[in-house]
């Protein structure tokens, strides 16, 4: 009986990832051009509905190649299955995010995701509007000076370019949270 229950949970999660993956191309992909110094940058606007403060999305496919862009929100991209690359604006930095690792970005940090493989790449994204993040989560992270700097820097520097690459997430806590969020959001 327990195995059947676990199987149903996994089916529900698999169905949620399928739904979010199918919805991904139809999100509000609104890129606006902004002048930054002597160059023009693409800025992705909020991908969710106007009344949403936090949203979950998922890319599922064998190949992803995004245009280099910035975004007006915090994001956490979790490599649920497979690996992908992220090209960061910071020092023309490239980082590979392996399965069970996270790439966390600030508002307006420039980046582009890319990857391809024989099997599907699944990236689950959690997007959080800046205002809600500052109002809700800031107190929680205030004890860690580095994290506090990472999340506060965009309030001072509109075009901050920091990212966090979380590796060695062996305990599964983030994976479990991302799975729950994907299932509930779908």
Give the role of each language-model region.
Residues 38-41, 48, 58, 82, ...:
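Generic, low-specificity signal for short hydrophobic/alpha-helical stretches with a mild N-terminal bias
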Residues 51-149:
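N-terminal regulatory/effector-sensing and dimerization cores
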Residues 9, 18, 33, 41, ...:
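Glutamate identity and glutamate-enriched acidic tracts
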């Amino acid at each position: 009986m327990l195995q059947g229950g676990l199987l149903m949970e996994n089916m529900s999660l698999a169905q949620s990832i399928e739904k979010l993956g199918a919805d991904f191309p139809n999100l509000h992909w609104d890129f606006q051009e902004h002048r930054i110094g002597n160059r023009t940058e693409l800025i992705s606007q909020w991908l969710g509905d106007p009344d949403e403060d936090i949203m979950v999305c998922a890319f599922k496919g064998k190949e992803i190649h995004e245009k280099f862009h910035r975004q007006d929100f915090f994001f956490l991209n979790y490599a649920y299955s497979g690996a992908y690359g992220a090209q960061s604006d910071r020092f023309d930095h490239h980082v590979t995010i392996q399965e069970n690792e996270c790439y966390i970005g600030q508002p307006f940090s420039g980046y582009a995701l890319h990857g391809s493989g024989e099997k599907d790449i699944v990236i689950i994204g959690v997007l959080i509007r800046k205002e809600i993040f500052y109002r809700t989560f800031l107190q929680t992270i205030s004890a860690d000076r580095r994290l506090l700097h990472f999340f506060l820097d965009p309030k001072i520097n509109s075009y901050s370019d920091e990212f966090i690459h979380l590796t060695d997430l062996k305990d599964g806590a983030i994976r479990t949270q991302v799975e729950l969020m994907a299932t509930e959001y779908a």
